[in-house]
């Protein structure tokens, strides 16, 4: 029996490797995805004042730091019973959308586009963002502009473009200025157009690679995402599971997550394998992220993105089970984030200074959930009478997807090795 090891994995926000064990006929018998880094943040925050934690946990991820900041502060809000002013909620949401715009542009154009724009058979030495810049400079310029504007939104609302600091229990420590609002409004229509341009690019590439999209990494799983009144929502208040064939839905609130999510320990990875507890392991394995969000929602919350979602469903089905379709789903979300950001920037409350409610530290248990760029993100803290964290649980977005990524790699390997 032979073995193929791919290490390190590239274009990965972290560290990992893949091992493929081959049977005597040279076909893949077993595939393992190893996540080889131990983080430890659940232990780091124990003994800390809870109000400090939203400034610690952004270090979990250099790309999704804003999502961790906001999920964390929402968890502390819930533990202490804070009632957040409407203006603070809107400014927090804009901060979150800025991170989504920045990260979704990075993920598609920097990590995925080299394979589509240059082709999967291109020399690996040029199959990267530098190669995209050489081959399609206008595409690269738009990607860079979207990242810049997204980061400017985070800075305007979060105080810093990297590791924001304004989220505090009860709201925000500062509000966005009218000057920053006006600067962002002047650019947002261009970002919406760039979002549409990205979708047009992806749809043209789909025609070339549709056979590959429909054959590699196609697996049946459950899907988990956030909705608000059934609509797609990055900052939503309701979690929804959808079954592999779309026939069954389960909805629950963040505080109920332990009733619905279980975690299975495997020997070959530091990551625990989450699953739908109502279904069991492994039948209840599920996916999160753009594909899942498109699959679980009844509709998008913005008009241009909703038209794109309908077209997506016609192309890939509903629910879509093709892993490579994550890329088009991500671009639909990128467009939606730009549309929603415009709505918020035109709302007078986006520059209101009423962004802080009084809140006192106390004993409590709170869960904060947001949709991070890679998928649904959970932070759960318990605090004592002095507001000190005594217990913490975090399920980061990529963790949900690790077991199903392993399944998708297994399926892709079987297809690729079928004819040796």
Swiss-Prot record:
Leftover remarks: The large subunit of Vhu is split into VhuA and VhuU. Each contributes two ligands to the [NiFeSe] center.
Cited PANTHER family: COENZYME F420 HYDROGENASE, SUBUNIT ALPHA, F420-NON-REDUCING HYDROGENASE VHU SUBUNIT A
Amino-acid positions noted as binding Ni(2+) in the UniProt annotation, renumbered to this chain: 61, 64
Family: Belongs to the [NiFe]/[NiFeSe] hydrogenase large subunit family.
Keyword Kinase: no
Keywords: Metal-binding, Nickel, Oxidoreductase
Enzyme class: oxidoreductase
Gene3D superfamilies xrefs: Cytochrome-c3 Hydrogenase, chain B (1.10.645.10)
SUPFAM superfamilies: HydB/Nqo4-like
Pfam families: NiFeSe_Hases
Name of the protein in question: F420-non-reducing hydrogenase vhu subunit A
Subunit-structure text: The F420-non-reducing hydrogenase vhu is composed of four subunits; VhuA, VhuD, VhuG and VhuU.
A GO molecular-function annotation: nickel cation binding
EC number: 1.12.99.-
Lineage: Archaea, Methanobacteriati, Methanobacteriota, Methanomada group, Methanococci
């Amino acid at each position: 029996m032979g073995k193929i090891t791919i290490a390190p994995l590239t274009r990965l926000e972290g560290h990992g490797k893949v091992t493929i064990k081959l049977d005597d006929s040279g076909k893949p018998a077993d595939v393992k995805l190893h996540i080889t880094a131990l983080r430890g943040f659940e232990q780091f925050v124990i003994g800390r004042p809870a109000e400090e934690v939203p400034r610690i946990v952004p270090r979990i991820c250099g790309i999704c730091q804003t999502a961790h900041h906001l999920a964390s502060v929402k968890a502390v809000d819930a533990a202490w019973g804070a009632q957040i002013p409407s203006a603070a909620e809107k400014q927090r949401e804009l901060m979150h959308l800025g991170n989504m715009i920045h990260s979704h542009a990075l993920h598609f154009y920097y990590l995925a586009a080299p394979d589509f724009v240059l082709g999967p058979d291109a020399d690996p030495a040029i199959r990267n963002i530098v190669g995209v810049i050489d081959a399609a400079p206008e595409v690269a310029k738009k990607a860079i502009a979207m990242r810049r504007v997204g980061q400017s939104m985070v800075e305007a609302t979060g105080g810093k473009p990297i590791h924001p600091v304004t989220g505090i229990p009860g709201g925000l420590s500062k509000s966005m200025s009218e000057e920053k609002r006006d600067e962002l409004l002047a650019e947002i229509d261009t970002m919406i157009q760039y979002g549409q341009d990205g979708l047009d690019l992806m749809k043209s590439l789909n025609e070339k690679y549709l056979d590959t999209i429909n054959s590699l990494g196609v697996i049946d799983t459950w899907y988990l995402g956030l909705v608000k009144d059934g609509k797609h929502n990055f900052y939503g208040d309701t979690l929804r599971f959808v079954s592999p064939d779309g026939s069954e839905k389960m909805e629950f609130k963040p505080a109920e997550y332990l009733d619905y999510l279980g975690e299975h320990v495997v020997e070959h990875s530091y990551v625990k394998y989450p699953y739908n507890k109502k279904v069991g392991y492994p039948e209840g394995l599920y996916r999160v992220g753009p594909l899942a969000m498109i699959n679980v929602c009844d509709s998008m919350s913005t008009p241009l993105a909703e038209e794109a979602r309908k077209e997506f469903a016609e192309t890939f089905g509903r629910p879509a089970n093709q892993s490579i379709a994550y890329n088009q789903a991500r671009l639909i979300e990128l467009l939606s984030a730009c549309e929603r950001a415009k709505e918020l920037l035109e709302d007078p409350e986006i520059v209101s200074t009423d962004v802080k409610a009084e809140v006192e530290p106390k004993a409590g248990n709170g869960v904060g959930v947001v949709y991070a760029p890679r998928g649904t993100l959970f932070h759960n803290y318990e605090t004592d009478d002095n507001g000190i964290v005594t217990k913490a649980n975090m399920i980061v977005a990529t963790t949900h997807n690790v077991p199903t990524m392993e399944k998708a790699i297994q399926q892709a390997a079987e297809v690729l090795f079928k004819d040796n």
